[in-house]
Regions:
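Active-site- or DNA-interface-adjacent structural scaffold in DNA-acting proteins
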Residues: 95-263
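Helix-centered, glycine/charged polyanion-binding patches within enzymatic domains
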Residues: 321-397
Length: 444
């Protein structure tokens, strides 16, 4: 059952009203007044049952989720900071200053799973609505990046060691008597596999890696022999994954780089400081003039950039039409998207080596592709100041949700900074007027 925040206009002798503590001209207060909380409650209220215990109010949990993404907090830290920050409490709909945690941080996990991709796209559309010009912007810029997964750097030795450890855990859980556990041996072999590039350690490291794989295969076969048929069926997918990890080579297709995140891909973007990144490919779509993100789409594996255009523009259209906007008519990209010139009604513009027919067209193209480079710092902000840089959420749904949430946080932070700039501008204007008046009085 959907819970609601009851507005309390009566004074309380033992509690302090937030409006008596905070500055009502603060940018976060202004931002809270601009967000359509009623629309969020109406849309997300459909996801709750009509029976059972009242849930956490949507204004509270959605507000905290927005604050978390704006200021790059974790599930735990945002709840802790909420207790000590009166502005954050006002943002989430409280009337009086609270001194206890609003809910357990694990509630964020359930809320994200409840919203899914459709709910987060609606939330993204509401952040686009805060920027009226963005929903009808004709030209957008598109680029791809890698959303890295929070996994250990994958090596054959480490993956084989994890397979061995997992087999030991399964044997202990199912009471299977193993001929040998290899706990001590595998630990030493993993150490021997370190620094295999050194000439004096190369031979030893190669032998250690081979031995770890041999032990892993041996333990998997032993479990397949000794486990009962019904139990073996439960672990069938796990054992297939272990076998694939233990036999994959350098040139193997669809390699597994993490046992707990098997969807992780290895992507090379040509960076000098980071040759390979392990995660998922994400396409970012931003407006040319406003800089607002209208689409941030996750893709499985490592598809060619041109293959991401159709779904990215479709998501941008869905997000913008939810707030009365239109589909972009022009999308400027880099040369990595070559091969596509039109996606439905959207023209794809790519830099060409051929000269334009006139000086004017040359200048228009030059300005367009200079402006397109602005998406690079946008991606940098998404990674450094929001959650796109390292994804801690589990599974494919975690990849999708984390990408969308980073875009939501970016759009909100943009509006927050705009409000802050407006306040500073009016203060400067007021100081200028007062200074002019005092100067005239002194001259008289």
């Amino acid at each position: 059952m959907l819970g609601k925040i009851k507005s309390d206009f009566q004074q309380n002798l033992f509690q302090t009203r937030l409006t008596d503590l905070i500055n009502l001209g603060h940018p976060l207060v202004k931002l809270a007044q601009e967000i359509s909380w009623d629309k969020l409650e109406f849309e997300f209220g459909k996801l709750y049952s009509d029976q059972g215990r009242p849930s956490i109010p949507i204004r509270k949990i959605a507000g905290l989720l927005l604050l978390k993404e704006m200021f790059k907090e974790s599930d735990e830290s945002v709840v802790e900071r909420w207790i000590e920050n009166a502005y954050w409490q006002y943002f989430t709909g409280e009337d009086f200053f609270q001194t206890k945690q609003p809910f357990d941080p694990s509630e964020f996990v359930h809320f994200r799973k409840r919203l899914k991709e459709d709910g987060l796209e609606f939330l993204l559309s509401q952040t686009v609505a805060l920027h009226p010009e963005a929903k009808n912007e004709k030209e957008v810029q598109i680029d791809t990046t890698v959303q890295e997964k929070n996994i250990s750097f994958p090596t054959d030795a480490k993956l084989a060691k994890k397979v061995i450890d997992n087999c030991i855990k399964i044997a202990e859980k199912e009471n299977v008597a193993q001929r040998q556990t290899y706990k001590r041996v595998s630990k030493q072999l993993l150490r021997d596999a370190y620094f295999g590039h050194h000439p004096k350690r190369k031979k030893k490291a190669i032998m250690a890696r081979k031995k770890l794989r041999t032990i892993g295969k041996r333990l998997v076969r032993e479990l397949e022999r000794k486990l009962p048929g019904e139990v073996l069926q439960q672990y069938a997918d796990e054992f297939e994954k272990y076998k694939k990890v233990l036999i994959q080579e350098r040139g193997s297709k669809e390699k597994i780089y993490s046992l707990h995140e098997p969807q992780t891909a290895c992507i090379a973007k040509g960076k000098a400081h980071k040759a390979y990144e392990f995660g998922t490919k994400v396409a970012v779509t931003r407006g040319r003039k406003t800089g607002i993100i209208s689409s941030i789409k996750r893709f499985a594996g490592n598809p060619h950039d041109s293959k991401t255009l159709e779904e990215s523009l479709a998501q941008s259209q869905r997000v913008r039409t939810q707030v009365g906007g239109t589909r972009p008519t022009i999308a400027s990209t880099d040369r990595g998207f070559r091969g596509v010139t039109q996606v439905e009604t959207t023209q794809i513009v790519i830099p060409k080596n051929t000269k334009e027919s006139s000086r004017y067209k040359q200048e228009v193209a030059r300005k367009r592709f200079r402006a397109r480079a602005a998406i690079e710092p946008t991606i940098s902000h998404l990674k450094r100041n929001h959650s796109l840089g390292l994804n801690f959420l589990k599974g494919v749904s975690g990849d999708v949700n984390n990408a969308l949430l980073s875009g939501i946080g970016y759009n909100l932070k943009m509006r927050f900074n705009q409000i802050k700039a407006q306040i500073i501008h009016w203060l400067e204007f007021l100081i200028f007027v007062l200074a002019s008046v005092f100067l005239k009085i002194n001259l008289k």
